[in-house]
Amino acid sequence: MKGIIYKSTGSWYLVKAEDGTYYNARLRGKFKHLDLKVTNPLSVGDFVDMNIDPLTPTEAMIFNIEPRTNYIIRRSSHKTAFGHLIACNIDQSILLVTLKQPKTSIGFIDRFLISCEAFRIPAVIVFNKSDLYNEALMEEYLYLKDVYEPLGYRCILTSMEKENGLDELMPLLQNKISVVSGHSGVGKSTLINKIFPQLDIKTDIISDHSQKGKHTTTFAEMYDLNETSKVIDTPGIKELGLFEIENDVLSHYFPEMRSLMGQCRFHNCKHTNEPGCRVKEYVEAFKIAPTRYESYCSIIFEKDTHR
């Protein structure tokens, strides 16, 4: 019997079969998938084959994982040599960010977009909590919108508190499997509650001391918006370490740098200190946003110092 993973709790998985029946399932024995070094062999969105337990008809044993079309992955916070799958087989990612309470760093945004670019997953950036914006924060939003939208990342301004912007976001969720990601406290669970009011998911709490969110969604879970649309809620990501993306291909995942491939003096240019670098010329001419280049250099330096 075939099914799709709707929730992963570590050792048990909630699987929806093709006939709409849900099963609590386990993975048979030790399982390696495509030699991918991950802490979680199965992820929400995975298509699987399973056998129903004849003694317990509500349970099943997973014996095969279908090939994945794509996935979003981050470096494991506990085992840095391993990755941790966030979601698989998705059509688009919705990144919720906030400029206040808590503030999402530009570096985090860029790292997430790199993870999406690695598998050509379209990304939408949702700037939430606009009801907290003053004039300076609105200017910051407009600047970031001017940076990201020309690169192909749609930007939407929302306030879950005031229900502003949902009319622009909701149509984008139709006929797709969408994964919602971001820091704790940015409003992911609140968004899911707006989309699925019958769920009444516990919402994020902001610590007065740290101004950072506390985890409320413990495990990723997928919900049916309708017969052709699904939304995946994910736990808050504190830090997003890139996994299996080497320095020599990092620029490929920056659209503004990818368009300049082959134009540098040296074919193996890292776009940092080399002479005749076309990318640096564009940065100096403000044709590439300085914040994007800073993110690129930060990742390059981080990887070089941890070799």
Swiss-Prot record:
Gene symbol of the encoding locus: rsgA
Protein name per UniProt:
Small ribosomal subunit biogenesis GTPase RsgA
Q: How does it assemble?
A: Monomer. Associates with 30S ribosomal subunit, binds 16S rRNA.
Give UniProt keywords alphabetically: Cytoplasm, GTP-binding, Hydrolase, Metal-binding, Nucleotide-binding, Ribosome biogenesis, RNA-binding, rRNA-binding, Zinc
> Cofactor: bound how, per the entry note?
Binds 1 zinc ion per subunit.
Q: Which residues bind Zn(2+)?
A: 264, 269, 271, 277
Q: Which GO terms describe its molecular function?
A: GTP binding; GTPase activity; metal ion binding; rRNA binding
Cross-referenced InterPro entries, in alphabetical order? G_CP_dom, NA-bd_OB-fold, P-loop_NTPase, Ribosome_biogen_GTPase_RsgA, RsgA_GTPase_dom, RsgA_N
Principal localisation: cytoplasm
